[in-house]
Amino acid sequence: MLRTLSLVLFTLVSVSALAQGGPPYYTNDPGTPGPFNWEINIGYMPFFYSNQSVSHTPDVDINFGVGERLQLTYENAWLRVQNPGSKTEFGLGQSNPGVKWRFYDGGESGLSVSVFPQFFLNNPNDAVRRGITPPSQSFLLPFEFSKKFGPVDVDYEIGYQAVHKGPDGWITGLVLGHEFTKKFELDMETYLPGTFHPAQFQPTIDFGGRYKIHSPVILLFMAGRALEPTRSNQTYFLGYFGLQFLLPPKSYNRE
């Protein structure tokens, strides 16, 4: 039932979706920091499977605004990987550089659309040999859509992933959110990554929010799980718990 609901939601908003995407969620939105502004997200991200646990301790996501509509991004994480019967491994994850361009901007409540090409690259260390990162490297080409419908912010993302030494895949995600006050918002996300050959996908659902502690610091939190019955490659718990820093502070409105 939950999987059916998530697929229906994707269908309804794929034709319409600056909204609630980005950390702590997997789905991105068309928003950018603005010229010469920084958005830095630092978080703890646990992924618990029936036969393994992987944690980003921490995950660091750095974004820099180049003009009003362009953003440069770099993300990486220090990973903790625990497999039953073996010692815990630590190491650097894949580097994730990217460029986001919001090529259509409908204003605060109108439709906005962006493209966000990204690479996922292994670093020159032994993380692949130790099973910390996958041997495959990839290029992701997603498009993001956002629009406000009354009190609800809608963000939708869909993309194609070309994989070297692995099956090509796709991603799609939806975030629905509402700002209850100027400082506090709550959101729901459904996220669906998959591969073409073999035809597989792993839908997840999560709930989270943001709380503006003090400009320019924002608390980020999210928790969720897989929608399908737990298998060895399905997460029975996933989360994000961290902080967002908007710099320089004078560039953002104080509330």
Where are these regions (language model features)?
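Positively charged n-region of N-terminal signal peptides that target proteins for export
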Residues: 1-4
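Transmembrane beta-barrel domains of Gram-negative outer membranes and organellar outer membranes
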Residues: 19-255
